[in-house]
């Protein structure tokens, strides 16, 4: 992706005026001016127009001396230089906050940080967001905070992807900070639409596809994009993981394979089916469960059937995976927590510091909710029915049906406590209907995730002395 040219490139000030302004800045800060001014003169002798510096090769821009770098920081924070996202990503700014004191940049960054605080972001996360994302966005665009646009954030994201490809570094800090910044800008009213997960999800799919042949990777990603409109996000993510595992296996057994149409039952599918039965968990090293084996096979079978039904080109013209290839799964009755284990777990959850997720688990237990139903609850989910008490409206879930669950006074008080701990902010789009919704469970301006719930329950179960617990057990307890 080629980054667009800036619409508000700074004008070229007189070098003498820049030196005078820098000297006054140094004097106001009580710093020695001689060496710093000497470095500034050298910079302006080499690049009388700071815009020429911005157009130089990245290696040249990064090779200047530290004292010259301090002058560059001054130019940046005063709006005289847009050094390029590649430079802003590659360079570590030690004195950025100090240098921008008293500027519009500082005021905008402070306003951004206050909004992040109101949404519940921790101090360290807020600091990273402000410096790594917000400040760099404002510097390179030359805009005030209220003037930022979706295109500006997308341009920054594209620059991070270019830097990742150029350096081989993951740059996860930048990726996360930009994602969080979208949330803050939306709740500030700067961005008009809630953050879309599709862009971040697509990058996640591409990263998962590492080691997959390019031809297959393109088909897999296109298939996942097609699923977004009809499947839950976690379903698409799981499908991406399974297709990536399949693609890496194919790369090992047939490095020259470049298209699905080349797949052969004897040469590719049967060896892969055998490999699935012998697969081990990437962390524990234990054999994967039969249910996971079935999910891996089903993901590939459904993909092959879907693309053939849709009439995609270069796909197999015959069935490659059959019902007899799927392992049979034992069907035990739903497991519940024994009374003593349930009592210990509730005591631990009542004392956990992360109230929003701990209370979510307590509400799931009290109402017998599926985890998806729990997280889809809306802020106005409690309904008072005259003469019949309080009821919880459970939204469309796994079975695509709504239902009402009676509430006792203790559970109503629990929901009131959840409302106090949830993150405030603007409504978010429902992943299925697309309508704007005030969800009950929000944190840092976004929805609480299933992963966080599972992690919280796992930690609480360990603290309570339980070997294992998963959210669905709470539904049946």
Q: Where do the language-model regions lie?
A:
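Flexible interdomain linker/hinge and immediately adjacent N-terminus
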Residues: 193-212, 312-347, 391-402, 433-448
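Conserved tyrosine-mediated DNA breakage-rejoining catalytic core shared by Y-recombinases
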Residues: 271, 376-423
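Short, charged phosphate-coordinating catalytic segments
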Residues: 305-314, 363-387
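Charge-rich, intrinsically disordered N-terminal extensions
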Residues: 1-319, 328-331, 347-352, 362, ...
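Extended, hydrophobic alpha-helical segments in both membrane/secreted and soluble proteins
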Residues: 370-374, 378, 403, 411, ...
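Basic, Lys/Arg- and aromatic-enriched nucleic-acid-binding interface segment
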Residues: 290, 330, 339-375, 432-436, ...
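Active-site/catalytic core of tyrosine-dependent DNA strand-transfer enzymes
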Residues: 408-466
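Short, basic (Lys/Arg/His-rich) helix/loop patches that form interaction surfaces
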Residues: 120, 124-125, 357, 367, ...
């Amino acid at each position: 992706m080629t980054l667009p040219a800036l619409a508000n490139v700074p004008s070229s000030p007189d070098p003498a005026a820049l030196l005078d302004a820098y000297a006054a800045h140094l004097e106001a800060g009580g710093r020695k001016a001689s060496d710093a001014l000497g470095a500034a003169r050298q910079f302006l002798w080499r690049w009388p127009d700071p815009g020429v510096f911005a157009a130089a090769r990245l290696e040249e821009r990064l090779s200047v001396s530290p004292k010259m770098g301090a002058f560059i920081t001054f130019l940046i924070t005063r709006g005289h230089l847009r050094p390029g996202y590649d430079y802003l990503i590659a360079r570590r700014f030690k004195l950025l906050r100090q240098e921008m004191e008293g500027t519009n940049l500082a005021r905008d960054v402070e306003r951004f940080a206050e909004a992040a605080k109101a949404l519940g972001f921790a101090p360290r996360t807020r600091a990273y967001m402000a410096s790594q994302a917000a400040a760099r966005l404002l510097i390179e665009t030359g805009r005030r905070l209220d003037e930022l646009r979706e295109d500006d954030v997308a341009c920054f994201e594209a620059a991070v992807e270019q830097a990742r490809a150029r350096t081989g570094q993951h740059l996860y800090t930048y990726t996360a900070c930009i994602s969080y910044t979208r949330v803050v800008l939306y709740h500030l009213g700067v961005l008009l639409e809630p953050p879309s997960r599709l862009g971040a999800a697509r990058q996640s799919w591409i990263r998962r596809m590492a080691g997959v042949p390019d031809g297959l990777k393109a088909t897999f990603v296109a298939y996942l994009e097609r699923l977004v409109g009809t499947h839950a996000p976690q379903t698409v993510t799981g499908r991406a993981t399974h297709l990536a595992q399949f693609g890496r296996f194919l790369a090992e057994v047939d490095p020259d394979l470049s298209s699905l149409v080349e797949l052969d039952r004897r040469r590719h599918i049967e060896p892969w089916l055998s490999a699935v039965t012998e697969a081990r968990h990437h962390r524990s090293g234990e054999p994967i469960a039969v249910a996971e084996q079935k999910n891996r096979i089903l993901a590939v079978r459904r993909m092959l059937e879907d693309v053939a039904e849709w009439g995609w080109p270069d796909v197999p013209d015959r069935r490659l995976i059959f019902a007899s290839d799927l392992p049979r799964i034992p069907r035990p009755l739903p497991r519940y927590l024994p009374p003593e284990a349930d009592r210990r777990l509730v005591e631990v959850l009542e004392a956990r510091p992360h109230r929003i997720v701990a209370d979510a688990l307590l509400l799931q237990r009290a109402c017998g909710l599926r985890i998806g139903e729990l997280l889809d609850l809306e802020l106005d989910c409690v309904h008072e029915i005259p003469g019949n008490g309080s009821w919880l409206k459970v939204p469309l879930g796994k079975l695509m049906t709504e239902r009402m669950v009676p509430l006792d006074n203790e559970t109503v008080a629990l929901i009131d406590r959840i409302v106090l701990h949830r993150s405030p902010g603007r409504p978010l789009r429902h992943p299925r209907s697309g309508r704007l919704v005030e969800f009950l469970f929000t944190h840092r301006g976004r929805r609480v995730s299933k992963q966080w719930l599972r992690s919280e329950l796992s930690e609480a179960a360990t603290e309570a002395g339980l070997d294992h617990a998963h959210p669905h057990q709470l539904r049946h307890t």
